[in-house]
């Protein structure tokens, strides 16, 4: 379906719908009914949880993870966007505004791009390996850049009376059953109904930006 209007997209890394939202943003930039619609899609992606953009500020934390200064004037950006497209004040939200502003967790800073994924991003394929025993962190699951050969399948026993515990992550709207955000996953990784695939130790920092 064609996209018909300029838009300012607010997203959160720990929202349950971050993947589909960014896919829709990408769709809007390519399927606008005209150049105005296609060329005026803007996205801001912060490290907050669902609908918590207003919490972005100095000394920001998501779950257990300290992320430094994540300040973003959320309301101010909305007003400026409205001034440009609803009140014909182009100087309020100039055309030089970056198309995408996203918070890079790890180096803990806001970055900009004119597209998503960023132009410098390289699509990389990773493969799951094991000897058939990828269960828990004590298993033999590996994550590799090499395609697997003739390896046995991994399996686990599912017990609905004892489901896998969920700790953090992207979530919303569950009445507080799960608190979204970044949390230590070691309690989950020791259970045998979870498959774990771990890469070799990285020799240098790696930035992940794009669709996963």
Regions found by a protein language model. Give the residues of each.
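Active-site-proximal cap/loop segments of hydrolase catalytic domains
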Residues: 1-94
């Amino acid at each position: 379906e064609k996209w018909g209007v300029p838009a300012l997209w607010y997203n959160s890394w720990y929202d349950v719908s971050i993947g589909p939202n960014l896919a829709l943003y990408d769709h809007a930039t390519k399927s606008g009914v005209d150049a105005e619609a296609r060329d005026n899609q803007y996205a801001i992606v912060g490290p907050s949880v669902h609908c918590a953009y207003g919490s972005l500020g100095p000394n920001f934390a998501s779950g257990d993870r300290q992320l430094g200064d994540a300040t973003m004037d959320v309301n101010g950006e909305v007003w400026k966007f409205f001034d440009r497209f609803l009140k014909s004040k182009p100087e309020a939200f100039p055309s030089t505004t970056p198309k995408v502003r996203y918070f890079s967790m790890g180096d803990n800073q806001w970055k900009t791009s004119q597209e998503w994924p960023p132009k410098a991003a390289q699509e990389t394929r990773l493969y799951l390996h094991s000897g058939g025993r990828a269960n828990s962190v004590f298993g033999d699951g590996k994550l590799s850049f090499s395609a697997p050969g003739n390896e046995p399948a991994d399996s686990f026993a599912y017990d609905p009376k004892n489901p896998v515990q969920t700790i953090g992550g992207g979530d919303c709207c569950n009445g507080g059953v799960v608190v979204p955000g970044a949390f230590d996953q070691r309690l989950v990784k020791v259970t045998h109904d979870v498959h774990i695939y771990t890469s070799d130790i990285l020799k240098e920092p790696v930035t992940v930006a794009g669709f996963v």
